[in-house]
């Protein structure tokens, strides 16, 4: 496998994503070529090194004070930034695609709220080791769990986006030449939401609760990306900034894993690739790439306030965004943006 970002996925990431496949829980179509042995038949030593490096990096970050977690596939492929006004949406890299099929009654989840919701779900599932999540007795109680103000904007968005998210269907697809692996993921198996949006502080007799789908629970608790929830909260005015933060944390995490397992220590990401991964609403032209790049770098300045050590491990070139291994886990960082 190519270790460069031309392939958009590192070896260990592909292994992590394909682990359910190797265990027989993913559907797969395979062209029986050399690619199969390259992608799926890593030597036991290679797998051992990668898995050990993942575990070490994860434990380092966990011990350093992670306050939140996010599924690795949601750090690579993102939700819509704005209402796409459609029932189907997909985004991703050349190797990984996240697609979302919205419930026709509730619409597509978009913006900052479902990003915070997904991070909270993952964090709670990791913290409690349970797929059963309590949302509280009213909306205000749940807003406090998300550390959001209990004003009209958030109350309305919370109700609409929570229902849109938990009633949507996710699909994650990983592809390489000759290999396709995919899995459909149900976010919530069942749930009871008793909120009255007109009376957000009115307590109900019962807790609102969700039971995560087994596939989603497994996906979000298997080697999730450690992060700081405080950073996501602070960056919530820009869904793109939230996406850049989680992606940067994830990519630095994977580079450190790669370095620990004796593999690649640098990733060169083409700007055109980042535009496909993050940028909706930009023209498919050189000017569209330049516009995306300018906005990405603008949002990155705010992101680096919450991951200052990463400054020393990133470079910008006309054609690429370059990341290098060595940045400390984000959870070890001292936030310098307390404003």
Can you describe what each PLM-predicted range is?
Residues 9-339:
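Charged, alpha-helix-forming regions
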Residues 2-7:
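Extreme N-terminal basic, low-complexity initiation segments
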């Amino acid at each position: 496998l190519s270790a460069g970002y031309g392939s958009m996925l590192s070896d260990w990431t592909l292994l992590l994503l394909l682990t359910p496949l190797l265990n027989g829980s993913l559907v797969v179509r395979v062209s029986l070529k050399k690619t199969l042995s390259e992608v799926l038949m890593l030597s036991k030593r290679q797998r051992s090194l990668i898995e050990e490096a993942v575990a070490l990096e994860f434990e380092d970050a966990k011990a350093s004070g992670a306050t939140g977690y996010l599924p690795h596939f949601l750090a690579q492929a993102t939700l819509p930034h704005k209402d796409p006004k459609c029932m189907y949406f997909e985004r991703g890299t050349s190797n990984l695609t996240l697609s979302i099929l919205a419930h026709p009654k509730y619409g597509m989840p978009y913006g900052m709220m479902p990003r915070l919701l997904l991070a909270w779900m993952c964090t709670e599932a990791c913290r409690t080791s349970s797929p059963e999540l309590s949302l509280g007795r009213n909306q205000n109680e749940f807003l406090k769990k998300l550390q959001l103000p209990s004003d009209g904007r958030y109350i309305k968005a919370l109700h609409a986006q929570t229902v849109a998210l938990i009633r949507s269907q996710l699909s994650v697809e990983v592809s390489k030449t000759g290999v396709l692996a995919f899995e459909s993921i149900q976010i919530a198996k069942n749930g009871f939401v008793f909120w009255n949006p007109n009376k957000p502080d009115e307590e109900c007799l019962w807790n609102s609760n969700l039971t995560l789908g087994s596939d989603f629970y497994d996906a979000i608790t298997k080697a999730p990306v450690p992060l700081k929830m405080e950073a996501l909260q602070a960056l919530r005015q820009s869904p793109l900034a939230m996406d850049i933060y989680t992606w940067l944390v994830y990519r630095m995490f994977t580079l450190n894993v790669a370095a620990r397992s004796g593999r690649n220590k640098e990733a060169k990401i083409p700007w055109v690739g980042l535009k496909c991964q993050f940028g909706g609403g930009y023209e498919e032209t050189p000017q569209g790439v330049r516009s995306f790049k300018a906005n990405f770098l603008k949002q990155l300045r705010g992101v680096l306030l919450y991951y200052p050590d990463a400054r020393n491990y990133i470079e910008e070139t006309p054609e690429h965004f370059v990341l290098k291994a060595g940045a400390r886990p984000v959870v070890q960082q001292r936030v310098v943006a307390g404003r």
